Each structure stands twice: as structure tokens, then as C-alpha cells.
């Protein structure tokens, strides 16, 4: 029985052996081999500098490229501005003079309570969300996006700069759902206005979805939105004459608060 001809066999032996003829070349023309050479194996101990910086939680890889070309990064005391430069994990890499440590990527989910601001530090001495996750990791974590002081609910922390950038950019359409409690019932007319889109001081805004919450008073509303504009949910309702009494983020990027009490993290 004849062995079936593989694709490799077909491409290399299409009926008869291919003959190669030597072509003449003159000065300035280099003879090239018809054989393909395998690329040298990459060194597993080397990583791109932009990835190193991103893994240290400073920023995304794209942003790291900008900082590198601007001269913000040094390797073993030498300023590196070359795109694609590679480093070893044992190299001494600094960003604006601060020593970086390429960490394992970590993610912490917090159910934020009220009266904490979303920032890594505050000059005015106000309580920050970092207090709540101080024991969650030894890595330098940063909050992904923000919740204002009086907003509760899901807040993600990570040292993964690329993921943080992706989750905060509106073009990626990251799903965020809020439970809103107003000072009075939301009228059907105003509900329709929100569904169709309204215009605020900083431009038009259209939510992904808004509806009354089942088996609850009409002053309680669920709203899904991917915009990251400052206080956007509160401003939508304030524009229509409502006061937001409670604002709770119940879903963020597919993550939920299930079995996560207020003020706790996992």
C-alpha cells in the first residue's frame, strides 16, 4: 500500500526533483542561499524593557515605550531610549530614579464602602482605598479606574499595567452595572430620556441600558454604562433633577460582589 503523500511531501516533490541553477552575480550583488535558516532561539531570561516596566505596575507597555524614548528609564545606571531593548530580571531598572521590581501579576477585588477616596495617596490626609487592601499583597497595586468617596461597590486593584489600561478605556466597552437609589421615583418620561441619551455640560452621553429594578420602588434603578467620565452616573440623574442617595457598582468587567461583604477583598 502506498503511503499517502503529506502536504510537506507535496510541496517538496511535485512529481520530480527541483533543480537549482547557479545564477551569475556581479559586484554589488550578493549571492543568497535558497535554504531558510532557523532564527536563533530567544533567551528566556531576557524580556523587553517596556514589558519589565509594565510588570512593575508603572503603566501599560505602550505608555512605557513613551517613557523609555523620553529618557525616564535607566538600566544598570545607563539611560535607555532604544525601542525593543531587552533586559534580564537581575538588571537594575529604575523609573525616574525609583527602583522597579518586575512582579508576578496580581489582582485584588474590593467591595468598597463609603467615605474612602480612590487614590494611592492623599496630601490632605483623607482615608484612601489603599488602607483597605494594604494586607492583600506585598506588590505595588493600583486601583483600576475610580469610585468617588460616597460610591460603594466593586473596585479592582492590580499591578498589571496593560490590563488596567484596557479596563479603563471606553473603546473596550467594559461592562459596568450600578444600582442607583434616588430621592424620588424616576418618571417614565425621564427613564426614556436616559435611554435615548442626554447632553451634559461636557457633551452627550448615552447609557448601554437603564431600567427599574424588579420588585423595588421606582426610585431604585439599574444602569449599565461603559463611559469613564467623572461622576457620570450621578450627573445623569442630577441633570434631570434627582438626588442620588446611594450608588453601588454591582458588576465590573464580569466580576460580581457575590459572597464579598462590604469593606472586604478577595
Predicted regions and their residues:
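N-terminal acidic, proline/glycine-rich, low-complexity intrinsically disordered segments
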Residues: 1-10
Amino acid at each position: 500500500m502506498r503511503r499517502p503523500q503529506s502536504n510537506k511531501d507535496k510541496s517538496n516533490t511535485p512529481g520530480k526533483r527541483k533543480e537549482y541553477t547557479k545564477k551569475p552575480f556581479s559586484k554589488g550583488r550578493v549571492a543568497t542561499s535558497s535554504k531558510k535558516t532557523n532564527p536563533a532561539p530567544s533567551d528566556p531570561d531576557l524580556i523587553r524593557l517596556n514589558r519589565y516596566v509594565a510588570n512593575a505596575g508603572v503603566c501599560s507597555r505602550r505608555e512605557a515605550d513613551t517613557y523609555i524614548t523620553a529618557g525616564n528609564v535607566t538600566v544598570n545606571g545607563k539611560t535607555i531610549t532604544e525601542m525593543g531593548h531587552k533586559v534580564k530580571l537581575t538588571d537594575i531598572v529604575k523609573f525616574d530614579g525609583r527602583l522597579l521590581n518586575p512582579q508576578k501579576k496580581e489582582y485584588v477585588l474590593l467591595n468598597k464602602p463609603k467615605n474612602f477616596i480612590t487614590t494611592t495617596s492623599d496630601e490632605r490626609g483623607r482615608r484612601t482605598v489603599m488602607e483597605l487592601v494594604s494586607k492583600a499583597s506585598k506588590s505595588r497595586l493600583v486601583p483600576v479606574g475610580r469610585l468617588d468617596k460616597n460610591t460603594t461597590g466593586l473596585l479592582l486593584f492590580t499591578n498589571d499595567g496593560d490590563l488596567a489600561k484596557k479596563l479603563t478605556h471606553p473603546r473596550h466597552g467594559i461592562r459596568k452595572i450600578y444600582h442607583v437609589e434616588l430621592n424620588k421615583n424616576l418618571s417614565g418620561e425621564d427613564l426614556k430620556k436616559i435611554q435615548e441619551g442626554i447632553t451634559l455640560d461636557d457633551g452627550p452621553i448615552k447609557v448601554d441600558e437603564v431600567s427599574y429594578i424588579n420588585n423595588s420602588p421606582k426610585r431604585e434603578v439599574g444602569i449599565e454604562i461603559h463611559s469613564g467620565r467623572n461622576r457620570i452616573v450621578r450627573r445623569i440623574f442630577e441633570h434631570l433633577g434627582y438626588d442620588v442617595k446611594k450608588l453601588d457598582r454591582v458588576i465590573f468587567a464580569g466580576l460580581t460582589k457575590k459572597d464579598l461583604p462590604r469593606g472586604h477583598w478577595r
